[in-house]
């Protein structure tokens, strides 16, 4: 059964249903509503109203996304890139990453321990393997090299 989003009420209801499942950014919500056949003007009107009512919040979405991805073992560079691909503003992303309260050093150590059981690399090949994995996860090379050299992260 196809849902027809031909009224403002239907667009709003669908948007609220999506927001009830999880936080969404405006760009993502717009895309999903367009896929369901809603007119762009109705989407904008409905989303403006939801924003005014505090039901749609980019800040809440950013906070939720950063927290979720960090708990999944991803670093700030990877999270920043994913949010950029979702159409969010770079300044908003950077602010969310700064204010999230996550210790990226601790996050790096936890991710490394889960993957490599806390074993420092014994040769260049293993060091490269661990470094590639952590870099792919979005941690800076500076943080990675400090961790893999066995130096205290707070130095």
Curated annotation (Swiss-Prot):
Query: In which compartments does the protein localize?
Result: Cytoplasm
Sorted alphabetically, which keywords does the UniProt record give? Cytoplasm
- One BP term from GO: regulation of DNA repair
Its principal location?
cytoplasm
Q: Which GO terms describe its cellular component?
A: cytoplasm
Fetch the InterPro entries from UniProt.
Answer: RecX_HTH_1st, RecX_HTH_2nd, RecX_HTH_3rd, Regulatory_RecX, WH-like_DNA-bd_sf
What's the superkingdom here? Bacteria
Q: Does the keyword Zinc apply?
A: no
The similarity comment for this entry is: Belongs to the RecX family.
| Chain's role | Modulates RecA activity.
What protein does this entry describe?
Regulatory protein RecX
What are the leading ranks of the lineage?
Bacteria, Pseudomonadati, Pseudomonadota, Gammaproteobacteria, Pseudomonadales
Name of the gene this protein is made from: recX
């Amino acid at each position: 059964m196809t849902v027809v989003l031909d009224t403002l009420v239907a667009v709003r209801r669908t948007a609220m249903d999506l927001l009830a499942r999880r936080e969404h950014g405006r760009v993502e919500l717009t895309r999903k509503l367009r896929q369901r056949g809603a007119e762009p003007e109705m989407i904008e009107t409905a989303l403006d109203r939801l924003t005014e009512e505090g039901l749609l919040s980019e800040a809440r979405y950013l906070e939720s996304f950063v927290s979720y991805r960090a708990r999944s073992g991803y670093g700030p560079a990877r999270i920043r890139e994913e949010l950029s691909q979702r159409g969010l503003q770079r300044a908003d992303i950077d602010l969310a990453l700064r204010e999230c309260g996550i210790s990226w050093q601790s996050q790096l150590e936890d991710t490394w321990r889960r993957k490599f059981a806390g074993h420092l690399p014994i040769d260049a090949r293993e060091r490269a393997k661990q470094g590639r994995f952590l870099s792919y996860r979005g941690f800076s090379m500076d943080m990675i090299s400090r961790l893999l050299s066995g130096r205290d992260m707070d130095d």
